[in-house]
Amino acid sequence: MNLLERVDHWGTVAPNKIAHVSGERTLSYGELRARSNALAAYLSGQVGDECAPIAMLGHREPEMLVAFLGAVKSGRAYVPIDTALPQQRIDNILAIARPALVLTAQETARVSAQGSETPLRPVQKNDPFYILFTSGSTGEPKGVIITRGCLEHFLNWMLGEQKFAERTETFLNQAPFSFDLSVMDLYCSLATGGTLFSISRDLVENPKLLYRALTNSNVTTWVSTPSFAQMCLIEETFREPMLPHVRRFLFCGETLPPQTVARLRERFPRAEVWNMYGPTEATVATTSIRIDDDVLKKYSPLPVGRPMPGVQVVIVDLAGEVLPPEQRGEIVIAGQNVSPGYLGRPDLTGQAFFEFEGERAYRTGDQGRLRDGLLFFEGRIDHQIKLSGYRIELGDIETNLLSLPQVRDAVVLPVTKNGAVLSLAAFVVLSAREQASDFVVGQALRKLLGQRLPVYMLPRKFLFLDAFPMTPNGKVDRARLAASL
């Protein structure tokens, strides 16, 4: 069965099974099947043969799922747009996407309540399934096209590797639907007859309500960014009694610190912890590894794993030549999970995508190296700076800070003036709050770092926070931190 057939299968054999929980609202598989079919019929009637995508403006409402499936059942890709985005950003996305129709949760609820027997013409394997917008270096968002074939290749790998139990799993949905990490929990859940448990931004902003919701969630598969888990670990009761059924933690989207894994394994001893890596352009995740005690002891920083079957990951130099193991270069991904390119931007597509050994390939802009058959992610190429003539990897300093037992989390940023880098600043979340002044603690950390790094890589300023600000996608908001310098 293909993905849409899998989801509709649960609507037939288990129509009362809950597919989605968002706050006080639920959506069953039977309702999802009937309403998405009705919406698909409506879209076919309204839009006709036009193949432009359907934009869906919302947050975590059940109607989002109805809209996604309704769009692809009508033969059109969907563009999820979270209402938390600034209006200017939403306007930019709509201008680039040029959707045939923009749906809201209210409109979707109204239209999908009307039954229909219209034959469906769903998207085919090579057709766009969804389009996600990511940040562009020019400030203009880029629409990444993911086909049904890309998504199903990713999904088949996930289902085979993780062995999710049918009809008994509850997946945590932390990331907004406009962020590709959500694709992991959304479609792994729908394909296996699971329940998707959404965490709204209101819960994230109110820890008391968040932990109450988690206690009542019955989550078995936790999917989030590492930053979100680190925020939860601040709460002392975030332990196995709060999530007694959790079987696995799946992390993607950011670097996973070893300290975070160690704390999770101590608090949730029966759960597995997985580290995964992949850009939006390669359909959510391309590599994975289970972080057991042996991996935790052997590697720091942690590896992001081995590639999925049917996909190659190679490291190339500036000339595009493949490098041998252990050498650092740009990560290139080639295979069936790679996007056909950016919506309406053949120029950007030509720069980032190419053919490698007969497969579509993508230049990630990420640095890494291969060691022991494992991929190690070593930060963005554009996170390199020059200070006093020295080329510095900010991620290198962060990794060394995170290796200190006093440090729970760390971000290092350049202090600039008129475009020139003057010095470095380290934002730090301490493992335990010190009695000494921030100045004294900062000097102590600088001294410890000085035992590991050359003097030109040592931050001049240390700023201490209880927790880092996060973007709507659940990643550390580096822009907000930089604005405070």
Locations of the language-model features?
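AMP-binding/adenylate-forming domain of the ANL superfamily
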Residues: 1-101, 106-131, 146, 153, ...
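AMP-dependent adenylate-forming
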Residues: 1-4, 87, 95, 101-121, ...
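Acidic-histidine catalytic/liganding microenvironments
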Residues: 14, 46, 96, 148, ...
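Extracytoplasmic/periplasmic beta-strand context in beta-sandwich domains
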Residues: 16-18, 52, 142-144, 286, ...
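Charged active-site motifs of nucleotide-sugar-dependent glycosyltransferases
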Residues: 52-53, 170, 330, 425
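Structural motif
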Residues: 55-57, 101-103, 223, 250, ...
